[in-house]
UniProtKB/Swiss-Prot annotation:
GO biological process, alphabetically ordered: translation
Region (Disordered) residue spans: 50-71
InterPro entries linked to this entry: Ribosomal_bS21 (IPR001911), Ribosomal_bS21_CS (IPR018278), Ribosomal_bS21_sf (IPR038380)
Biased composition (Basic and acidic residues): 60-71
Keywords: Ribonucleoprotein, Ribosomal protein
Organism annotation: Pseudomonas putida (strain ATCC 47054 / DSM 6125 / CFBP 8728 / NCIMB 11950 / KT2440)
The protein's name: Small ribosomal subunit protein bS21
GO cellular component: ribonucleoprotein complex; ribosome
């Protein structure tokens, strides 16, 4: 859990902004969303496999585009 120490004479808004940023970096909100409902292990594997395929396709497309620009 991210913690932020409020500095002396620091406005509340600035401290809140720092806390939100640290929560975002730690992935707290994403973790809460993923644990909001139970997901069957097979559904989780299927989702992760689909994400991997999508990432790979995106990587290949980026590499092909980069190769075209070199000529």
């Amino acid at each position: 859990m991210p913690a932020v120490k409020v500095k002396e004479n620091e406005p509340f808004d600035v401290a809140l902004r720092r806390f939100k940023r640290s929560c975002e970096k730690a992935g707290v909100l994403a973790e809460v969303r993923s644990r909001e409902f139970y997901e069957k292990p097979t559904a989780e594997r299927k989702r992760k496999a689909a994400a991997a395929v999508k990432r790979h396709a995106k990587k290949v497309q980026r590499e092909q585009r980069r190769a075209v620009r070199l000529y």
